[in-house]
């Protein structure tokens, strides 16, 4: 019980850390809920987010809560991860670089009863973080210049508690219940060199608190003692969020200093989409595991508050065509030559993955950015005098986010996750 209390303290600490960080520098995070997070742990990230069909006794796979029933009965698992990334932004021949590092997740799991596993943790849902400007002239003789400044920060996190049960041999079901919270604060400033033109600022903000429920199913089909296939499926409930969005328009006369502001509020402004996922994992002798995943986030039926000004008639209202359904396809796997071998290199898990995702944003009537990514990494066992089951998960990931009409992003990311796998529940025999 003391060790479980320590783990809970660690989880609270990492929760507070996560609340203070943003995991992106992308200008695309100025739209919608921001840049959607992968919601994967260290071993998933090396396979580019693959996991709906995976069942691991020594890893926490919160992509599918049905997998918790496979947790080893003698251990308590605690897994936390961080990432660092370098992104190159390019548009119309202009290129910029930006660095970013962030806390990613902290999760834990243990066997509650026979064929029943429990997991809890904190994972990101979305990230908002950008700061850039654009300048030019409003007339051909270049006598009046302008500077437009775009800033934003925020994001959403979720704390979950999940359970996985294997009621029938080779059939597991599970559920994750999550509390989600977060906010976003965005601003657009328009400043002019001509003192007769008022400067204009727009401020968008929201504070969101809601819940999320995700279900999972896994069916393992053994062909013989060395080969099997696990089929996985997930479903997440969609529902309205009873929180408001606010937009404030501030006009400033630079000659007199007089300010005029107008505030708009949209009630019940948000909604979580339904999510559907399916996956398959082929397992050969617990050495080679390869799989494919497909996921669908039904954003198209989700409105979002948008400010518009048509010939001086300003409004802040829900746009029913703001989002698009997001489809993601993932392929990957891992190979471990000999998990219990005396040769160190044979005990390492070698992982790879690739994925393609369609955009979930509809920006000014045009498709937002699609995403292509590949990854590779290692699961390195950590040896000490009392435990050889903990794992250091390291992976590298390249992500290309682009659209024909907008900025292209190329991101190189390093992910580091440390899985503590302790034998807390072993009964020691005294002779």
Each PLM stretch: what is its role?
Residues 21-46, 111-431:
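Outer-membrane beta-barrel porins/channels
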Residues 13-14, 75, 180, 297:
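Single-residue recognition of alpha-helix boundary sites
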Residues 1-25, 431:
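Bacterial Sec-dependent N-terminal signal peptides
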Residues 10, 58, 266-267:
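Residue-level detector of alpha-helical transmembrane segments in integral membrane proteins
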Residues 16-124, 325:
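N-terminal, post-signal peptide beta-strand-biased segments of exported outer-membrane/organellar beta-barrel
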